[in-house]
């Protein structure tokens, strides 16, 4: 058999373990017969890579993906021209509860391939069949070190290799033609011997079963270790609760209609081969590049997602705020491109993954979000900002239940202005709208001003404005003062001239081929700009505008761009005055700070609190720290008024510092890696090594330096091995 078919039910993140069921395998003794196949095969299994994503098992209420794996130098067959053949990607994730296979052989081959690549062997611990038909109904596949051997004649006794290891998967037949993983245990209790594992019965059997055609195929170069990953999907059987609701004119997709159009395919217009070549070339230079494809039942391509190693590394450091840009879909561009976007320590955008989507259905968004989450090792963002779309909103709550979903303020204001047809030639309404949205400091003030505005302009029956107001807690700044946004709320998403991160590269008529040809150039310019900003922040001394100690303090800490923004707040302290304490309750006090805005003077309430440990906490009604990540002018004036010569350290965010560590990997002492746990060593060392590999690909000099470093490292490790104990 060539390749394996794996049916995966995606899941919430590891932080959502309470949502993940633990299915139990139920066997009726009246209908099934237990068969024990305790093959005797000696060997020892390996460490498990740290890809611990507990996939939620919900056959009827979620959309699923079918992961197709084509082993190295084996040819994949059975796909039409819309499906990828011999594509290159990373190996499959570890087995998880909820995986489904088209046959028992596929399930066995998948687990055996997983074991072979990691370095252990498997055997059938037990299986059971129906009494009448002898049809196999279930099985348990275990690590070869499971259990203990019975003592036999001492003269013929072989070396004991079993350790009572509990690693296993439990399978059962469902729907007459599909096998499902009910239970998984990945932990081993013994040392590992990958070389011995490759000589085991299960792996020899797998190697000898390769087809003649496969054996005659030329093998890829030894330095290219690649595998194909393809995600298939079937239509969910149950309709989510939101499917029955209608959409307003301000929303951008038909949730109930698109959800059932499973036959729709991605129209690449001749760009399929270019996409295939693009993935292949990227993987030759970036081993940790990932892509996943969503194929319909007929093999046609529906959706594609890809992400490079740098993006995955950057997300581990800047994963607090994530934006999802669907400008191309919302405006019917020729290129159905979507992008996941983050914000780096310079306040600039970084690309955290791209996709090509066939439609804007709930099912499509769920597939995409789960594909992205899987590539990010199951770590969801804290804040997820999107445009307003009911299908997307439902998918976000399905895949990221713990994330705070917010709407792009720019997209909301754009939709509101577009809905007021009779006022589009006038600047009066946009000006009034901006005053209400940005000028109100308290909820009651905002709601009163909103009501007065819609009455003034005769919009009480405007459906879009009514729906936007119902969702006001997701986009209006007055409701978001307890949500850290890193300055992202006003980033342009949705109905704008071009996708903001690809501005200048993607236009309405940009083809897939044109986009792919400029993709690496775009990324190179982004990385080069970030490197220049890093260099500027580390080497240049910013020019100070005032003599205030806060400015000189942050000049040594913040990156150049963030410091310039903070510098504006320090300069604006001169327009603030009249600090007055209006209330005190123990350690907490309420102050009013006045600010002169043109000819007007406005009051800003600031809460000032000191703890027993003399730690200061401040909160301003303007919400400046939550929106921007550094303190506002009102708090700075109050801190100075109360005698603080430095900004408290809790208000100096690590994400804005010029000395932020760019290794993006866990340190041994960080608490995320247990030095005493061998299962985590592989993942930790692999990440470190891959970072050097990525840097080594930049130039000949980088490659030479990386090679020398690896050679020196290998010598040191060999010295430890040969060192007498």
UniProtKB/Swiss-Prot annotation:
FAR1 domain sequence ranges: 109-193
Residue spans, zinc finger SWIM-type: 604-643
Bias (Low complexity) ranges: 14-23, 207-217
Cellular-component GO terms for this entry: nucleus
Subcellular location: Nucleus
Chain spans, region Disordered: 1-24, 190-224
Family classification: Belongs to the FHY3/FAR1 family.
Protein name, entry field: Protein FAR1-RELATED SEQUENCE 8
Name of the gene this protein is made from: FRS8
